[in-house]
Structure formats: C-alpha cells, structure tokens
Amino acid sequence: MADASSRTDTSIVVDNDDKNHQLENGHSGAVMASNSSDRSDRSDKLMDQKTIRRLAQNREAARKSRLRKKAYVQQLESSKLKLAQLEQELQKARQQGIFISSSGDQTHAMSGNGALTFDLEYTRWLEEQNKQINELRTAVNAHASDSDLRLIVDGIMAHYDEVFKVKGVAAKADVFHILSGMWKTPAERCFLWLGGFRPSELLKLLANHLEPLTEQQLLGLNNLQESSQQAEDALSQGMEALQQSLADTLAGSLGSSGSSGNVANYMGQMAMAMGKLGTLENFLCQADNLRQQTLHQMQRILTIRQASRALLAIHDYFSRLRALSSLWLARPRE
C-alpha cells in the first residue's frame, strides 16, 4: 500500500512537472510569436507610410499637372476670345470706313486711332496670308505645274507689297508704334530691326531650304545678302546719329531757370527735336523698301519651285516665333 501511494505521488509530481514545462514552452512560444508579430506590424506600418507618402506625392504631381493643363487651356481660350474681339473691332472699323482698303487709295491718312486701325489691318493681313500659304503648300505637295505655282507665288508677293503700303500709311499716323513693333508678338520683337525683319538675316535662314542652287544663283544670293547687309548698316548708323543728335538737342539747357529767355530757348529746342523726329518716318520707309526689294530680287534669282519653298520657309519661321510667344505667355508659373 505504501509503495502504491509512493508511486502515485511520484506520478503526480512527474505529471505536474510535465505540465509546468509545457506551460513554460507554450508561454515562451507565445512571447516569440508576439515579438515576431510586433516586428511584422512595424514593418507593415513603415511600408504603409512609404506607400502613403508615395501615393500622396503622385496625387500632388497629378494635381499640379491638371492645374498646368487647365491654365494652358484657359490661356488658349483667352487668346481665341481676344482674336474674336479683334475681328469684331475690325468689322466695326470697316463699317465706319476708317480701315485701309486693299482696293482703295492707300495714301489716305488713317482717321481715329491710327495704331489700332493698323493692328486690325495687320490681323486681317495675317489671316489672308495664312490662306495663301496653305494654298501654296497644297500645290507644292501635289506637284502642281510651274504656271499654277507662279500664280500663287505672284499673289503672295503682291500681298507682301500690300502690308508695306499699309505700314507706310500707319507710320504717318504713329511712327513710334510701327518702329517699336508693338503690333508684333514678344518673340518677334526680340529680332526686330527698324520695324521689321533684317533682309540679310532672312537670306541666311533660307540658305538650307533652297538647295540645289546653280553657281549663278549662289553668286546672286551672296551679292544680294552683302548689299542688304551694307544697306542695313548704313540705316543703323543713320539711326544712331539721329538718336545722338536728338539727345544733344534735348540736353542743351538742362537745369536752367524758368526765365522768359530760357522758356523761349526751351521751346526752340523742342521745335528742333520735333523736326528731327520727323526723319524717323523716312528711316522706316527706307527699311521697308529694303525688305520689299530684297524679297522681289530673291524671287527673280530663284526658280518658281525654289521661290515657293522660300516663301513657305519664311512663313513657317515667323509662325513659329508667334507660337513661341503664345507658349511662353501660357507657361505655368509656380
């Protein structure tokens, strides 16, 4: 009986030890599992934070992109509205009889606001030129005959003659408006010379668009470019001399007292300055005449197909300058 009791007690002790060992192992496993779970949770949280930040950055970038696109579209819409307003003003000007008619007497002075009238006429001129250039491009791509191309080219050259006449009339009304190029886009004004393009620079731009050229054509174009450059230099020097003379006249009696004699001297100086300003119109007319003659001489040197390519290249160049101005003004500003 005692032995049985002893075995029973020993069995109970062993069983209890086994249970305690199992509990300890279970607790240790639970702790390890808990620690592993905590590390996994922290890792998941870090990954979630990175993902959230990345998504937030992507959303912000997309939002800014939408804003830039919206601003660009709004700028284009605004430009369309301005163009529509200009067309309406042009119609009003025509109804009131203050525009320069292409079939009428170009020597009549502009009435009303000369600068506005010229701007409206120039807008109309550009629209008509775009139509003519599109017709020429279609004919060139369709390999039209030389006679058909000549009709279109002659029409475009006559259209250039028209804008020079309109500028001459506008210069009588407001020579500063024409010289400053306020009727041009900002990018065009960067390359402006005496109210228009430099003929010699235009010939340089066309060099790669006219090949192949004969030796006689090359010689003719080189001579034309040199003579244009010499005429430009002479006009530029004349303008510099005029500016210096005008500055000297205006600075003649700076800081003088307001006596009657000084007032008379002041009025005399202003009269002299006004007379010198009158020569600005002459400089502008000479510069436009140089531009006009260069275009016509270029046409005479080239074949009709080369002249067609030249007119297309000239138009595309100035169109890109205008487009560059529009893109620059519509660029996103952050």
From Swiss-Prot:
Keyword Disulfide bond: no
Region of interest (Basic motif), residue spans: 50-70
Domain DOG1 span(s) in chain numbering: 115-331
A cellular-component GO term for this protein: nucleus
Biased composition (Basic and acidic residues): 38-49
Compositionally biased region (Polar residues): 1-13
Ranges where the record places region Disordered: 1-49
Stretches for region Leucine-zipper: 76-90
SUPFAM superfamilies for the chain: Leucine zipper domain
Family: Belongs to the bZIP family.
Quaternary data: Interacts with NPR1/NH1 and NPR3/NH3.
Note: Plants silencing TGA2.1 display increased tolerance to the bacterial blight pathogen Xanthomomas oryzae pv. oryzae, are dwarf, and present altered expression of pathogenesis-related (PR) genes.
Function noted in UniProt: Plays a negative role in rice basal defense responses to the bacterial blight pathogen Xanthomomas oryzae pv. oryzae (Xoo). May function in both positive and negative regulation of rice defense genes. Binds DNA in vitro. Acts as a transcriptional activator when bound to NPR1/NH1 in vitro. Binds to the promoter sequence of CRK10 in vitro.
Name of the protein in its database record: Transcription factor TGA2.1
Gene name in the database record: TGA2.1
